[in-house]
Amino acid sequence: LTYKDLLYASILPSGADATQALAYSLSRSINNFVNDMNTLAKKIGMKNSNFVNVTGLDIDNHYSTVSDLLKMLQYALRNETFKTIYTTKSYTLSNGLVVDATVKKYNNLMKLDISRIIGSKTGYTNKAGLCISSIFESNNHEFIFISTNAEFIYGNYYNLKDNLNIINFMDKNYNNQTTVKSTDIIKTIPVNFSNIPKYDVHLSKDALTYLPNDYNKDDIKVNYNGKTSITFLDNNKQIGKV
């Protein structure tokens, strides 16, 4: 059994035995590992969390919030090993046993399109209900989704359905909007030492911004930061930024 096996077994199928084995191996005891968890939580700004065990099961004084979980996930995703595991749907352990991500197990029953969920971790307790954190893709952008307190009704895991509903909502209501066209005149500046008195500043290409489809164009403000005049020496050079 390897550390990699334990990491995959902890994250993909939510193996409580794997998390406890890691705790003993890395910190010599569950309590020591919990202390390490709380120390790191404070370090990364998780002000409304306190951990008592390494399994996530309900117990007195063990709690967190969705906003704190977002901080934790953003921090963890900076680690390439974690990100690789988090975005894996299925993995073969060194003993040949195959472990699947819980969303894949859910979907064996629900038969939904989960291809846009790039990575995920689910959980359940009586107090928190069905939970999920995920990275998903919409219109070539990646987003983090975290929810709690979902239900299981008639074969439907609503933490997964909620995630898919959010993806559909983003697909329909948000996209890359052309906020400034390359043909738009940003600013007109004088040209020195030339028979051409002025130059119209344009973008080199259209500016695309991810916004709601019904965004108000009057809310878009364009600021130019660059040269206030040019000469022939500036030909084919960048003269500023927008």
Residue ranges, per PLM feature:
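Domain-terminus/edge residues, biased toward the C-terminal soluble/receptor-binding domains
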Residues: 46-50, 61-242
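Active-site-adjacent loops and short helices of periplasmic peptidoglycan-processing enzymes
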Residues: 1-67, 74-80
